[in-house]
Amino acid sequence: MRRTFSQLATRLLKSKDDELKSTLKYLTKGPVKLLGPLFESSEVNEQGSLLNRSRTKENNLQNHHIENILRILNSNLPEVESKKQKVAVHYDVLFSHLNSIVTQATDNKSSSSKELQGSSSEDLYDRLLLLQYVGKLTNVRQITEILLSKKFNKFDKVWEHRALFDEYQRVVISILLYYRTHDVQIRKDYEPRWLSDYSDLPFPLRRLLWRCLTSNVSEDNIRQNIIHYIKLLGANWRNNDLILIYQSLYEKSHILPDLTVLNHNKDDGFSFTQNQILLVRILRAISKCVEEEPKLVKKWLIDIVKLSIQSKIMLESPKKPSTPIMDQYKFIRSLDISIRSIHRTCQDKLIFEDLQVNLGSVLKMINEEEHELKTHLPLNLI
């Protein structure tokens, strides 16, 4: 302690303050026991003063030196307020730069789907969290593009930090993660929410959900499984969703519930538009041949499903016009072209003989529907 205060000698001796010099002399030459009060609490000092009332004068002198010592020590402390201001300015600048980096990194315009496909799993995971932190994770498509990316594999991390997302986002994430991992616990925890929130899910996610609900279900039981979930959905179910199921499970169309299975719902009936009936009939006929030439037949199915999605066939209703007549006509013309192409291919292959016959009947239905739609088109468009 004496050595510590002696180091201040040069500074103090240059001072004209005689009191400081006196204090330094008191510390360097006085008995060690006199230093004790410097490290005692005020309570201890008060107790000492009570026990040594006879030494009041000496204690006053000692306290005077203590005040001088404290003044010396405090004079060597940094200027806290000015330092705090400098640190605050530093962090303001730092976070301003960070905000700029994050904004640029999460800008939807600068991050196309192709760029996401080239990102690593770690980059995709970081992007998902960044979007959420800055409040830019605003739609299902953003989550879907990341979690369904072929390179993404941070499934456990996302599930571990699911509390960072709101309730609806967690439902979306649970569907996507179950689709990728088939984690039984995820389905056990969230299947009730999948059904209760079904009507709030966008169509692409509903299609994915039906793949989840029918995963690990044998072909013999898939029809009954779907009917079971239709009943569980209750008021959330719409008959048009059966078209969506066909779009989702197109490879198994021939074993899915037929359109007439919905006649139990008297309020909604089981009526479908002619385009919807054609779509289901085509998918059921073609899907029977998947095992014959899987690659070719799957391509046919995918092309037809894509066409039906682009034309929004699911939204058509026999009760009221829900799709512009021109869109319906475009679909039937495109469908005619696709089916004729498939029909020509079947002519050269014996294994597709039955399919060729079925598609021949379908082409007749397509022609009839095309003529019917033409009667509703403006003359200048015919």
From Swiss-Prot:
It comes from Saccharomyces cerevisiae (strain ATCC 204508 / S288c). This is MIOREX complex component 5. One of its GO terms (cellular component) is mitochondrion. It is found in: Mitochondrion. Keywords: Mitochondrion, Transit peptide. Present with 981 molecules/cell in log phase SD medium. Residues 1-12 form a transit peptide. Coiled coil: none annotated. Associates with the mitochondrial ribosome. Component of MIOREX complexes, large expressome-like assemblies of ribosomes with factors involved in all the steps of post-transcriptional gene expression.
